[in-house]
């Protein structure tokens, strides 16, 4: 059991029969009344986000999530195949389970598979990935004074707003938490 006062972003808890990851939290101490913790939780089974308020000091169960490092091999229809790098055991995940992460997945990429009591919950991507630009408008010389951006489509289909100097064929470093441009690789 863990106190809600000890909430941290990324903590995994069991509440109301579900497995939830803390996305955001805020300790609130009103002038009148008892303190409480307002939290935003993501259900790891369904991906749904729910806001929940806990009384300060309330205890919740901490979910024991195991992570396995696996390599993404290929897509077979709406099934995506991953391989355990130590045992060579293969695991298939449905497209619905990894819908958000598909925009960043490349073949042979290493990812962490999250498991709870032998049930696969989803995947955890690295903080940044390198993606190749396949389609973007050419940059116009002298158009950089405003520091603007233009859309660029990557090899996975993700559209990222990039600076004007980025061209087709360039490799970008993209933040996987929000899909934003970090730098050129």
Curated annotation (Swiss-Prot):
Gene3D superfamilies registered for this protein in UniProt: 2.30.30.30, Nucleic acid-binding proteins
Keyword Protein biosynthesis: yes
Highest rank taxon of the organism: Bacteria
InterPro entries: Elong-fact-P_C, NA-bd_OB-fold, Rib_uL2_dom2, Transl_elong_fac_P/YeiP, Transl_elong_KOW-like, Transl_elong_P/YeiP_cen, Transl_elong_P/YeiP_CS, Transl_elongation_fac_P
PROSITE patterns, A to Z: EFP
Main localization (coarse): cytoplasm
Cystines in this chain: none
Keywords of the record: Cytoplasm, Elongation factor, Protein biosynthesis
One cellular component (GO) term of this entry: cytoplasm
MF (Gene Ontology): translation elongation factor activity
Pathway: Protein biosynthesis; polypeptide chain elongation
Function: Involved in peptide bond synthesis. Stimulates efficient translation and peptide-bond synthesis on native or reconstituted 70S ribosomes in vitro. Probably functions indirectly by altering the affinity of the ribosome for aminoacyl-tRNA, thus increasing their reactivity as acceptors for peptidyl transferase.
Descriptive protein name: Elongation factor P
Record organism: Bacillus velezensis (strain DSM 23117 / BGSC 10A6 / LMG 26770 / FZB42)
Gene: efp
